[in-house]
Amino acid sequence: MRGRCRRLLALLALLMLLPAFAATAAERRLTSVGSDTLGELLQAWAQAYADGDATLRFQIRTPGSAAAPAALATGAADLGPMSRAMTAEEAADYQRRRGREPGRVRIAYDAVALFVHPDNPLRSLRLADVARIWAADEHCGGADAMRWSELGVGGALADQPLLRLGRNTASGTFEFFQQAALCGGGYRTDVVQFPGAGAIVAAVARTPNAIGYAGLGHANGLVRVLPLARGDEDAVLPDAATVIAGRYPLARPLYLYFNRADDGRPSPEVAAFLRFALSPRAQEIAARHGFVALPAADVSRESGQLQ
């Protein structure tokens, strides 16, 4: 009698576990490894995309754009968000491992903004001044700017040294800024590097003599964004109009890279998410996060890759 009871209890326990086993078996997962700049947007997209779908799970890691190519090539990621294009070396290494080129969809535009403390009286900068602040040599700008007075700042800040903040080498923003603002030259050795853009903005907010760069989506009321000029043009703030028109000097496209199947297309699960990323709803979310939504012509072109 006791043996039958034990067997019955064991059977009941097994039956209670079956729904959990079934749910686990049916669960689908998308893994994203890459850009810190795109981290919060990917989280928001994942939440919106997975609403009402209990079987879909997203895993989003943001070590930086440099991590995306290898994560895709090894199969550790389904999506590789990058705030810059893959380098020729990264693309060649990917093709060597996978036997084909990666897929890539442009998902939004961004601007790398220059941030100063609200009490800093500096009104604007020229691109050549940016090189004077961050570059290790003078081939792109002019003589190094060491104190704020050398950038035209007066008052209590004039004799203060510049505290230069920037991203670390794993960041796509680090590489984009190096090419677009420093003429491809090296960074000064006294640039304080951060793994995340949010930490740069937070440091500027509490340090009157600091200046940093990060994606525009990290702007907040605790810091001030500087207008920026190219050559003799008027300085402009980064916004949707100046980015799309090409007037803001540090504008850039943002990408989601993916693995292609033998037919050149992404997997059905990845393709469905990419179509969502190009949808009006997702583009509206991107705009709310400080990015610039794709124009209709861009959406049409990028969507063509998913047909």
Segments the model singles out, each with a brief description of its role:
Residues 1-11:
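Bacterial N-terminal signal peptides that target proteins for export
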Residues 9-20:
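Bacterial N-terminal signal peptides
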Residues 25-307:
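Flexible loop/hinge segments at secondary-structure junctions
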